């Protein structure tokens, strides 16, 4: 059950743990004192938008026509293609009798992911780490998907990114690749994770996986090009552009609000999220199977410090399920950093590499 810190020089391991602890204290203070970036309460929210679009689709209206009507009626900017979601998730929802069916399907997908996550954690940990992780994962996704949350494509995308990560961790790169591509087709915000996966495949010189990525991304390019054409056909000369854009530099406060968009964290004050975020990152980086997840979470945190409107905190659903993998590992990570070193263990930096230990 040893983490990376067990074979690391103790001075370095202790420094990392200390930085995580100080970061947690700083984030707690920030959470309690900084102005809330999403303080403006909108009577009509993005979930309302997509519920109304879905209602029109159930009445027989096509996705793009329905999206144009609802977005225009509620003052959304229409001239940028990125204000229009790609249609995959809404088309899938429109095929189901109600959103309850979608919630059940997502629960089934999450349950399958839990089994794979359990196997992944048990490969290097024990049941005391695996059980809290899978419980946290289940509620972090399912509680977000209740009520109106299921229409938000970020929830399904985050579940698929998690499925991809655990399959890579179990050595099933093909399933991991397909799950990642499914996430991308549902929401283009999965693109940072896709680039991370391609980088991992290149580092490992996995030629077959790189071919798979070339084919998959070519298909996505065709799909998004078709989406672009459909959007351009809907835009009228009188349609307005969004005057603000997404580059807002919301900083650490907005990052915390995205991290708070988690089925479990949402039940607690923001300062709890602030305290647990560094612990989860510490656990992911210390866990020998956690590097892909750690890099993914860190990448999204950096992006959201710059990109995102104040009400886009729900983008956190893309990465917050991964935090549940890291939280249990923060405890053995701290123990390995603080425990006295055995002389025979000092020269050894790493044990035998795990499936996804890069």
Identify what each model region corresponds to.
Residues 1-35:
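Start-transfer (signal-anchor) and selected internal transmembrane alpha helices
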Residues 30, 196, 203-279, 289-297:
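Membrane-lumen/periplasm interface segments of specific transmembrane helices
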Residues 52-98:
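Short hydrophobic/aromatic helix or loop-helix immediately within or flanking a transmembrane segment
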Residues 81, 85, 101-108, 141-156, ...:
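Membrane-embedded glycan-lipid processing machinery
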Residues 91-95, 100-126:
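Transmembrane-helix motifs of polytopic, lipid-linked glycan transferases
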Residues 117-140, 159:
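Transmembrane-helix signature of polytopic, membrane-embedded enzymes
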Residues 132-136, 287-306:
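Transmembrane alpha-helix segments characteristic
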Residues 161-167, 173-201, 218:
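Membrane-interface alpha helices of multi-pass inner-membrane proteins
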